[in-house]
Amino acid sequence: VKGFTDFNTVEWVLRFTNQGKKNTPEIANIKVSDITFRYQHPGAFNLHHSEGSHASKSDFSQQLTILSPGDNLYMRPEGGRSSQMRMPFFNIESPANQGVIVAIGWTGTWFADVRCADQQSVALTSGIERLKTYLYPEESIRTSSVCLSFWNGSDRMKGHNQFRRFVQAHHTWKVGGKPTVYPISTSFNYGDPTP
């Protein structure tokens, strides 16, 4: 667990190591997060999330799901890619002018379930979808990571900007204290022209 008080942010990852001499029992249905957030003011929760990529004009478009008590949104990417059809970043906005940006760090199929428990509470569970394994002696694995960036204010973009600054400060590759600038950045797909 790492805390970043300058950004009201916390992140963690779970690790499993078999320190025994035999294989472990089955490891499955791991919830990397299982948290309920409770707020003072009642009302509906706004879940701001984005489509992932599916090779269309609507790639990465913003989505809004309003969660009332009993509602939930189960999110997962498709095709084993971390952002196919669904992005692993979203913002839970409470009726109390507070919220939390959630980021899931995993290169495969993660899941997140956001559930409105009542007019003041929203629950988050997340992890790796279909994780079902065991460990040989001395073998180790890790789970997806979770990052929660808490924000306050009437404008949810304050949370987005705070999270961007956090990523720049703590997760952007730097050389000599400055973000790395590469001479070229490109990708090729679906018949794009080569440079």
Task: Give the label of every model feature segment.
Residues 28-32, 133, 151-159:
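OB-fold single-stranded nucleic acid-binding module
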Residues 1-115, 129-131:
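Polysaccharide-binding surfaces and accessory modules of carbohydrate-active proteins
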Residues 103, 113-116, 135, 154-156, ...:
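Short conserved micro-motifs at the rims of enzyme active sites and ligand-binding pockets
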Residues 35, 107, 148, 187-191:
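Active-site beta-loop-alpha junctions enriched in small/polar residues
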Residues 133-152:
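Short Pro-Gly-centered flexible turn/kink motifs
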Residues 96, 118, 178-180:
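A short, polar/charged loop/turn motif at coil->beta-strand junctions and beta-hairpin connectors
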Residues 143, 156-195:
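An acidic-aromatic substrate-binding cleft motif
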Residues 116-136:
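Short acidic, Pro/Gly- and aromatic-enriched capping/linker segments at domain boundaries
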